Amino acid sequence: MGEMTAIRDAYGAALKELGEQDVRIVGLEADVASSTKSGIFGSAFPERYFNVGISELNMVAMAAGLARTGFIPFVNTFAVFLTTRGADPVQSLIAYDSLNVKLCGAYCGLSDSYDGASHQAITD
């Protein structure tokens, strides 16, 4: 049996690898680069990586705009904030127009017990 790897470490490495293969891939994150490991991509491609701060709604809207101009955005945040704060623009700006945006929610369900109830995605 091979060595076990944390999902977030595998995700960060895979995102970096995808970025090496396609210059259209951009990363957006809500001040969670170390938690989601999306910062691995950001370190490799700082010109294609945007930390928007704790602003999921705006991050999703930015991703929609980037997708409309030919980029392939990967949106990175905790699942609970993506499915609550980011829900409206996901529906109205991305889903209705079938835009090519990748929504990556880390720590789904009760998996983030350390950070408490505010970070537990029981509605995702």
Each language-model region and where it sits:
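Thiamine diphosphate
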Residues: 1-124
